[in-house]
Amino acid sequence: MSFQEHEKQHIEKNVKRKLTDTELQILAAEWSEHCSYKSSKKHLRMLPTTGPNVIVEKGYDSGVLDVGDGFVVTVHIESHNHPSAVEPFGGAATGVGGVIRDILSAGTRPIALFDGLRFGNIENDAHARWLFKNAVSGIADYGNCLGIPTIGGEVEFDDCYKNYALVDVAAVGFGKKSKLIKNHANVDDLVLLIGGSTGRDGVGGSQFASDALEGEDRSAVQIPDPFIEKLIIEAILECRDANCINAMKDLGGGGLSCAISETAESLGIGIELDVKNVHLRESDLSPDEIMISESQERMLIISDPNNLSKIKEICNKFRIQCSVIGTVKEDKMMHVKNGDETIALLPADFVARGPLVDREKSKPEYLSKLPSSPSSKSEMSFSDILLKLLSSPNIASKHWVFRQYDHEVGIRTVIKPGFDSSVLRLDNGKSLSVKIDGNPKHCYIDPRQGAIGCFEEACRNVVCTGATPMGMVAHPQ
């Protein structure tokens, strides 16, 4: 755990006292690159976020699009690279679980998954083959257990990914516009933790995901449990239908630290919680570990006290745990207690809005060394060139990958994996065309034109199914 000099100055200027150990852990988690986007946020703000079909609400972790007839589609993409490079099965599986809960937090049912995968050269690298095989298995296992089809994606292999993996997972949700969670909170509302128990898995995961990968820190990789996730989905949607949820957020990077601070900041409220009320997997967890644990399959809910009995009834029905861990306050503070002892007391916006970093930038030297024109004519015959291309793992059929995914479950899949774009049947009689595309080599040679090319390719693939592009999510990395 370390802070940059400008972050130390920011703390001294705003807090004016020595921070407790718990406060330091909370800030280290929330201000990590993984959670705060401190280096990229200023650039991401350049992206257009409004449109005729876009619904913008407070606190959503997924994009929401109005598809007419009173229905909405939610979409989100994120990566789980570091964990997948260390423990590919668990890392990829928990990546699926996290993106699904982001869809769920808006109040929509997850209906489809996509993945974008990058690995080293599997033709001559046994480690790359191990990463590839197990990451695909992790995605397949989690999605198949949930009954959510993985209906598309892409896989690419290159020497530049040696000893590493890029694992992007995207999810699509669907629901009624009237059932969207209108995130809000009232003073004295209850703060509930629903789902899996809190353990040591994933402690320090946000800092781990923000640093250069130098070793195999398996303790920072979360443990997946898709069966608990399935129960959470059904329980949350039943609570939604019973109008028991005022606000909701997934516990992802940074665990409770980030979920509490970001929820309080976005809603303009204070939250007081007691770590002794958190249901635990290991009884000897310290308060700091409880706050920054990234154990999976957990959701934070804010609800009116009058709805508590109904929520507990639903959770008991699905056999998932539900704990009242705190209450909503008016003071806009993040107040963490360990019984009667206050272990952290900070303004929620101070925690959630960490200082941004304006990093130096310069044109990479390698760009000036690239040839200005194509290389001389190859001595290979056209037949040999064609055979070499067709034998490349990047062009060869990816049937081995998508045959492991149940892309039929849910009976929505109209156009299946292997085509230009996948198409889903929606309940309002319309169809949704979705595609994930990337071109790392083009972006490496010309970042601007490469990004434009990725966007254009995705649009063209969607258009090939007869659909009109209406929204995009991106995950630059």
Locate the predicted segments by residue.
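Glycine/proline-enriched, intrinsically flexible loops and inter-domain linkers
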Residues: 1-477
